[in-house]
Every structure is written in structure tokens, then in C-alpha cells.
Design a protein with these regions (language model features):
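Aromatic- and Gly/Pro-enriched, solvent-exposed loop/edge beta-strand patches characteristic
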Residues: 87-162
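Sparse, context-dependent recognition of short Cys/His-centered cofactor- or disulfide-binding micro-motifs
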Residues: 5, 50-54, 58-63, 103-110, ...
């Protein structure tokens, strides 16, 4: 009888030990958010999805859009589509407040009018901080509304709020912050994959 009592006691202790250790194993896994590409929502919200004209070899410009993430996150990839071949297309992310370059990447556009995606080392973005995303090129897709009217900024595109569009005349070697704001067109196409991290 004493042996049976000892066995039951050991059995009870082992059940408690297993149940306590399994509590530690049930920690929730961190949430993994889906990647977002803000371009389609930007084009729809601005109306610039209505008309597109290819522009080739039309002088070199640094052009793009400013934006603020509404959540903390990161850029995981760059996406571009232009109407000409360019093996050294430079895409740049700027700090909009200081007008300084955060990161530049070169993308090889081997075929005209084909979307190219380049995975990059993730670039962390701070919630509500304004950034500028530009490309340096003499080719672009000029997107407008059919009636030529202006878009109203800001434009919400998921967790990214587009705050404006601008350009500046440049050279292939220069990286110059765009200061000529426009709201009647968008030259592109360039965008990124954004992923919320918290």
C-alpha cells in the first residue's frame, strides 16, 4: 500500500511539472504583418490611374513622392517600372526633414515596361516620420487624371500616407533632393514593399 501511495505521489508531481512547463511553451508567437505596396492605392486615391503616357530620354530628373508611415515598419524591397532599359537605375530614400540620403540602391531594368522588384536589406521606418522616395532617370510613365486636374494630398494608401510629389533637374551622377512640388501628375513607376513591425 505504501508503494502505491508513493507511486501516486510521484505521478501527481510529474503531472504538475509537465503542466507548468507547458505554460512556458505556449508563449504567443510575434505577429508577422503582410507586406504592402502603396502605389495602387496612391494612384487610385489621386486619380492618376486614369491616364498614362510613356516618356523616354526627356532629361534627367530626381523625382518621386514623400510619405509618412502610420505605423513603425520597414522597407523590404524596391519596385520599379519605366518605359526604357536602364542597368543602373538609382532609387533613393531620404529623410524629408533634413533632406539627407538614408539609402540609395541601384536596380537593373533589363526590359522596358516590365516591373522589376529588388529585395534589399530592410530599412527601418519610424511611425509618423516623413520620408521621400525618389528615382534618378530620364524615363518615366507620366500619370494624370483624364481632365488634368490636381490631386489633393495627403492620400492614404494602407499604412502609408502619401504627402506629396516633387522633382528636380539632375544628372546621372548627382543625387539632389526634389523641391519642385506638383499635384497634377505623377511620374513613375517606383514604389516599395512596406511591412509593419509593431
Amino acid at each position: 500500500m505504501k508503494t502505491l501511495k508513493t507511486i501516486l505521489t510521484l505521478f501527481t508531481i510529474s503531472i504538475f511539472a509537465v503542466s507548468c512547463s507547458s505554460d512556458d511553451d505556449n508563449k504567443p508567437e510575434p505577429i508577422k504583418y503582410n507586406e504592402e505596396n502603396p502605389l495602387d492605392a496612391y494612384m487610385a486615391g489621386s486619380g492618376f490611374s486614369q491616364k498614362a503616357v510613356d516618356v523616354k530620354n526627356s532629361g534627367i530628373y530626381e523625382y518621386g513622392f514623400s510619405f509618412k508611415p502610420t505605423v513603425t515598419g520597414k522597407i523590404n524591397a524596391l519596385i520599379v517600372k519605366i518605359p526604357d532599359v536602364n542597368s543602373t537605375l538609382r532609387i533613393t530614400l531620404w529623410d524629408a526633414a533634413t533632406k539627407t540620403v538614408i539609402k540609395s540602391e541601384v536596380v537593373n531594368v533589363a526590359t522596358a515596361n516590365v516591373t522589376v522588384e529588388k529585395a534589399i536589406t530592410p530599412i527601418a521606418l519610424t511611425k509618423d516620420k516623413e520620408y521621400f522616395f525618389t528615382v534618378n532617370s530620364d524615363d518615366w510613365i507620366n500619370r494624370t487624371k483624364t481632365d488634368g486636374s490636381a490631386a489633393t494630398y495627403p492620400i492614404v494608401a494602407g499604412n502609408i500616407t502619401i504627402t506629396g510629389y516633387a522633382y528636380i533637374s539632375s544628372t546621372a551622377a548627382e543625387t539632389i533632393f526634389p523641391t519642385n512640388a506638383r499635384n497634377t501628375y505623377y511620374a513613375g513607376d517606383m514604389t516599395f514593399k512596406f511591412q509593419q513591425t509593431e
